[in-house]
Design a protein with these regions (language model features):
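Generic alpha-helical secondary structure signal
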Residues: 4-5, 20, 43, 73-77, ...
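The feature marks the first
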Residues: 1-39, 76, 102
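Extended intrinsically disordered, low-complexity coil regions enriched in Ser, Thr, Gly, Ala
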Residues: 2, 36-65, 107-139
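Generic signature of intrinsically disordered, low-complexity segments enriched in small/polar residues
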Residues: 6-9, 28, 61, 81-82, ...
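A domain-level signal for the structural core that forms small-molecule/cofactor-binding pockets
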Residues: 13-15, 19-22, 85-98, 102-103, ...
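Short, solvent-exposed interaction modules
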Residues: 56-111
Length: 141
């Protein structure tokens, strides 16, 4: 998938939003995912993303991507980080995160997506739309 197509599909799914807001939401969502993945997962995923999005999976210092160790945090914290970084209410951060992941799922091969998901705790299936919200899910509240 090309960069502009990724942006356009994301914009359609998360409307309303300006082009710069959509780009910010993608960057925040992918960078937060990148923090949760081990380097091999980030590398596999970034290899299939448009070049303009590759750096979003890595911490950047002075414009250069820096590989970091993974951080282990639950799905609720993932959504909280997205909400804080994108200056969004929590429910909107959940919605946008899921929509970006929906576009991401169409941008990479099923094998890479499965490999990435296998490296995350089961609760992250909700992020990818593969599991319903449970009664104790932060998104069900």
């Amino acid at each position: 998938m090309q960069y502009q197509e990724f942006l356009n599909l994301t914009a359609e799914k998360i409307a309303p939003g300006t082009a710069s807001e959509v780009r910010k939401f993608i960057a925040v969502t992918l960078s937060t995912l990148g923090e949760r993945l081990y380097r091999t997962g980030r590398d596999e995923l970034s290899a299939q993303l448009p070049k303009e999005l590759k750096g979003d999976l890595y911490l950047e210092v002075d414009g250069e991507a820096v590989r970091t160790d993974t951080e282990r945090f639950p799905l609720e914290e993932y959504y909280q980080r997205v909400a804080a970084r994108a200056d969004l209410p929590y429910p909107r951060a959940v919605e946008i995160s899921r929509k970006v992941m929906e576009v991401l799922a169409g941008a990479v091969t099923p094998e890479v997506l499965a490999a990435v998901k296998s490296r995350l705790p089961e609760e992250y299936d909700q992020l990818f739309g593969d599991a319903p919200d449970s009664p104790t899910s932060p998104t069900a509240v």
